[in-house]
């Protein structure tokens, strides 16, 4: 395949995802993301979540038949999460699951101590994560743009760390969990009004296949 053919392949596959891939299920989209990769798909996914989360989704994708197998496994996990996490936004993209908890669900305003209701939600999530141990969990903290850049960065780090610490205390293996604080750098809405700022104050979880799941999927796919 030459450079021009690759260019149009990426554009075409990007268009499929952008229009919702009406003839494709979510597992088949996993194969598409892996094949197309890169900027075209990333731009589409990035409209639904922060760029950091979108990058994690793309970076974890292996595509092809193995990617479709992983996608089916993620479909099952996402369905279970949707049943018990009514206060979270759960998105299936490619071979990954992205969970978005708004600030008010987990923390008080400008706080990094988990609320009682947050602990209840995280307990439910931890039960599912333990049931499916062959995934990695990336926890990403975000703030709005009010306050100084340094303050917001530190707050986002503390919030991501608080969530990670709680999941570990709920017996989710520490080796599966990583955290990052993005501060105000990765908004999903405008910071010019209260509604937009509330959307930007969030914690995202990106759940991806670990190496064991990927190798098993490749073997099952005959790759």
Placement of each model-derived feature along the sequence:
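Bacterial N-terminal signal peptides that target proteins for export
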Residues: 1-9
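C-terminal motif of bacterial Sec signal peptides marking the signal peptidase cleavage site
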Residues: 16-20
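Short, low-complexity, glycine-enriched hydrophobic/amphipathic alpha-helices that associate
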Residues: 22-80
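Soluble non-cytosolic domains of exported or imported proteins
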Residues: 31, 35, 52, 56, ...
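Periplasmic peptidoglycan-binding/anchoring modules of Gram-negative envelope and division proteins
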Residues: 83-84, 107-141, 168, 198-200, ...
């Amino acid at each position: 395949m030459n450079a021009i053919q690759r260019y149009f392949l990426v554009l075409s596959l990007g268009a499929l995802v952008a229009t919702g891939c009406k003839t494709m299920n979510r597992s088949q989209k996993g194969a598409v993301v892996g094949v197309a990769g890169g900027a075209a798909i990333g731009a589409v996914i990035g409209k639904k979540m922060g760029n950091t989360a979108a990058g994690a989704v793309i970076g974890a994708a292996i595509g092809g038949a193995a990617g479709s197998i992983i996608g089916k496994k993620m479909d099952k996990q996402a369905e279970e999460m949707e049943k018990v996490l009514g206060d979270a936004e759960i998105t299936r993209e490619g071979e990954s699951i992205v969970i978005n908890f708004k600030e008010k669900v987990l923390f008080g305003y400008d706080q990094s101590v988990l609320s009682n209701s947050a602990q209840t939600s995280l307990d439910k999530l931890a039960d599912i994560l333990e049931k499916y141990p062959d995934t990695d969990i990336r926890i990403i903290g975000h703030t709005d743009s009010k306050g100084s850049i340094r303050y917001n960065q530190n707050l986002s780090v503390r919030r991501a760390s608080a969530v990670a610490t709680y999941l570990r205390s709920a017996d989710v293996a520490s080796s599966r969990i990583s955290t990052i604080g993005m501060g105000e750098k990765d908004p999903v809405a405008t910071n010019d009004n209260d509604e937009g700022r509330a959307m930007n104050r969030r914690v995202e979880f990106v759940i991806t296949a670990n190496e064991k799941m990927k190798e098993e999927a490749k073997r099952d796919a005959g790759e």
